[in-house]
Curated annotation (Swiss-Prot):
GO terms for biological process: translation. It comes from Solidesulfovibrio magneticus (strain ATCC 700980 / DSM 13731 / RS-1). Keywords: Ribonucleoprotein, Ribosomal protein, RNA-binding, rRNA-binding, tRNA-binding. GO terms for molecular function: rRNA binding; structural constituent of ribosome; tRNA binding. This is Large ribosomal subunit protein uL5.
């Protein structure tokens, strides 16, 4: 059991049960999975960039990243169906807990002028999406070897039914929201 998972079981779940008055332990919101997505618009012209992104996202996530391809051709973007446009990885169970622990305790505090994560990334159903502008905030990335600074989207999917429940879940786990 990972550190963050233990915090969830011992502190977060009982607090959520008390706060929202759940009668069953299965009603308590929990994390389903975390999805990391790196969209690379210029990847259609540069194959080296997509390979670099896959290697870096694999290092960050601890799991092999998959190349995402264009579903439709768009002439204005010089994009053909099947061209690589980014990469993504979905984390579940222990890898998810390890990644979230690393994100909240190591990566986010390394962001320049970090004052907290804005809470406007909730989708209305308790899931939270966060944009990261520089992937170099993660400890696995060697800043000297980075050729292109890339951003990524981190989506945390929960079983919560409302934003209030999802926010409290992430807040109790240690997500540094803006005050």
């Amino acid at each position: 059991m990972t550190r963050l998972e233990q915090i969830y079981a011992e502190k977060v779940a009982p607090e959520l049960k008390k706060e929202f008055g759940y009668t069953s332990s299965m009603q308590i919101p929990r994390l389903s999975f975390v999805s990391l997505n790196m969209g690379l618009g210029e990847a259609s012209n540069n194959n080296k960039l997509i390979e670099e992104a896959v290697v870096e996202l694999t290092a960050i996530a601890g799991q092999k990243a998959v190349i995402t391809r264009a579903r439709k051709s768009i002439a204005a973007f010089k994009l053909r169906e099947g061209m690589p446009v980014g990469c993504r990885v979905t984390l579940r169970r222990d890898r998810m807990w390890d990644y979230l622990d690393k994100l909240m305790n190591f990566a986010l505090p390394r962001v320049r002028d970090f004052r907290g994560v804005p809470d406007r990334g909730f989708d209305g159903r308790g899931n939270f999406t966060l944009g990261i502008r520089e992937h170099s905030i993660f400890p696995e990335i060697n800043v000297d070897r980075v050729e292109h600074v890339k951003g990524m989207n981190v989506t945390i999917v929960t079983t919560a039914t409302a934003d209030k429940e999802g926010k409290m879940l992430l807040d109790l786990l240690g997500m540094p929201f803006k005050k």
